[in-house]
Amino acid sequence: MLLLLILADDFTGALDTGVQFAACGIPTRVVVGEQVDFAANDAAVLVVDTETRHLSAAKAYAVIAKLTREAMSAGVFSIYKKTDSALRGNIGAELSALLKTSGERRLPFLPAFPQIDRVTRDGVHYISGVPVTESPFGIDPFEPVRHARVTELIGEQTDVPAYSFPTLKEGEAVPEQEGILVFDAGSLGDLASTGRALFRNGRPRLMAGCAGFAALLPDLMKMPGRRTVTMPKLLSLIHISEPTRLQLIS
């Protein structure tokens, strides 16, 4: 039974999110492209690499809207829009496509990945202690990130309202504003606290974030799986990003 659909905009993102579930022994499948047979899926978690990272905002919107529509028609309840932890790609267009097509009122978005020092404070996204626009991602040769304030970045591509909120305390009510709700997180504990608040009244239909928050979903969603899994020991990666190279060296 499909418990969760994850929409990632590139192959790396699909894998680094899918592994959060596979590592817990949860049946996980990764597919590439927008032609997906949801009825034929036999995994608990389906990760779709939509290949929309480098498309125009309009084309990316269309792909996410199509997949959202088809997934809901097939009975998929929960959808997670996986975003880049450095805020690259068509984030505003894709979040708005998911929200508008679903008919839901709000979409909680937790962009932080504190496990690798990417955090959100007072609505501003930081990479290794500096605003993302001042990090290497701000001078990316293909997709420089132009806004560190997450709501401003979202607003570049959509008219859907976006609001910034501090970390939710466990038991705290989810804000009632309709639109995209961006939550701060400076630690894994912050992500977990907001996650528990979001799940307090049941499983959300829509969620968004990077692999950081996705790592908490197996427990938040109470997904069945084996907790001890043998993983391969060899990793081969080619990447132009200096932060990625330094992570591998360390």
Over which residues does each language-model region extend?
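N-terminal signal-anchor module of multipass membrane proteins
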Residues: 5-25, 52
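Short, flexible loop segments at boundaries between secondary-structure elements
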Residues: 210-234
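Cap/lid and interdomain-hinge subdomains that line or gate substrate/regulatory clefts
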Residues: 1-3, 27, 31, 44, ...
